[in-house]
A protein has these predicted regions:
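Catalytic core of pol beta-like nucleotidyltransferases
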Residues: 1-9, 24-31, 39-209
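Short gly/ser-rich loop at a beta-strand->alpha-helix junction or flexible surface loop bordering the NTP-binding
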Residues: 14-23
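Short beta-strand->loop micro-motif that forms the acidic, two-metal-ion catalytic signature
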Residues: 36
Length: 209
C-alpha cells in the first residue's frame, strides 16, 4: 500500500489523498484493487484504472473546485470509513465529516417499507418454483436484492455487498450461514430458509406486525 501511495503522490502531486476499500481496512486479497480519492490543485476530474506494483487501481482524482463547489455527499459515500493519508487543505476531512453526517441523518426504512420489501421477497420465492428460464432469473434477483433488504430490515445502512456480507458474518453468523447455503445451493428449501431469516428479523424489529 505504501508503495502505491508513493507512486500516486509522484504522479499527481495531490493536495490530499484518502484511501478506502480493502487495502485501507486490511481485507485485500490477490484480486483486490486499490481504492482512493485524490484532491489536486487544478486539472480535470479523472479515473485512474492503471496498474501499479502489480495492483489494479480504482482511483478518482478531483480538482479542489469539485469539493469546494456545491455537491451531493451521496456521490462520495465510499470514503465514509476511509483513511486520510494526507490533507493539506482540510477539504478531505471536511468531506468525510459531511458524508458521515449524511449517513447518520438518512432515516432508516420504517415498518411499511420493509414489509413491502419482505412481501416482494416472498413473491420472488414463489416464482422461483417455476423452474424455467424466468424462474431462474427470479432466483438470482432474489439472492442479490435480498442482501440490501436484509440490511434495511435490521436497521443497517447498506454500503454495498462486501461490507454487508462482512457485517453479517461478524454480527449475525447464523444468518450468514443460511445465506451462504442459499448462494451455494439455491434450492427452494435453502431460499425459503433465507426468507425465514428476513421474516424473523422483521418480527424482532417490528414486534407489532
Amino acid at each position: 500500500m505504501n508503495e502505491i501511495i508513493t507512486a500516486l503522490e509522484a504522479k499527481y502531486h495531490p493536495l490530499g489523498m484518502i484511501a478506502y476499500g480493502s487495502y485501507a481496512d486490511g481485507t485485500n486479497n490477490l484480486n483486490s484493487d486499490f481504492d482512493a480519492l485524490l484532491l489536486t490543485d487544478s486539472g480535470s476530474e479523472l479515473h485512474d484504472s492503471s496498474v501499479m506494483s502489480g495492483v489494479e487501481l480504482d482511483v478518482w482524482v478531483y480538482p479542489r473546485v469539485k469539493i469546494e463547489a456545491p455537491h451531493d455527499a451521496y456521490e462520495f459515500l465510499q470514503i465514509w470509513d476511509g483513511i486520510i493519508i494526507s490533507d493539506e487543505t482540510g477539504l478531505l476531512s471536511s468531506l468525510q465529516t459531511e458524508v458521515r453526517e449524511y449517513i447518520h441523518s438518512t432515516a432508516a426504512k420504517g415498518r411499511e417499507e420493509n414489509l413491502q420489501n419482505l412481501n416482494w421477497c416472498r413473491k420472488m420465492l414463489a416464482r422461483t418454483e417455476r423452474g424455467d428460464f424466468e424462474g431462474r432469473y427470479r432466483r438470482c434477483r432474489l439472492l442479490t436484492d435480498s442482501l440490501e433488504i436484509y440490511c434495511n430490515i435490521v436497521g443497517e445502512y447498506f454500503f454495498g455487498a462486501k461490507k454487508a456480507l462482512r457485517y453479517m458474518q461478524q454480527y449475525a453468523p447464523d444468518a450468514a450461514t443460511v445465506y451462504d447455503a442459499a448462494l451455494s445451493s439455491p434450492t427452494f428449501e435453502n431460499l425459503q430458509r433465507w426468507i425465514e431469516i428476513l421474516e424473523k428479523n422483521f418480527a424482532t424489529r417490528f414486534p407489532d406486525s
